[in-house]
Amino acid sequence: MYKRQGWYEWQRQENIKTPYFHFLPDNLLYFAGIYNLSSGCAVVTCESANNISHIHHRQPLLLDENQINEWISGKHEISRILDDQLSFYQVSKRVNSPKNNDKELLYKI
């Protein structure tokens, strides 16, 4: 499980990539994850929620606080109860460079 403020995703239209920040208003997000000692860790993804599918076809599998123990204990059929609450907005293309790492990357444009 990964606790995050949100995530970036890029909408592609021909040769143009537009970055968006996805988040849950007034809450942190918990991403479902997997871990293996020899190969490391990864965020589990799923098909995008209807309200963000026009930006990208996949998103992290989101857990609410009540689903965390279910995920950790091995229940892998998780209801996607947070999907309808997701919000997003366009952000600066500065997020495209790993050289940039400041709070302004989260600013709405």
Predicted regions and their residues:
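A structured binding-face within diverse protein domains that lines the active/interaction site
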Residues: 3-109
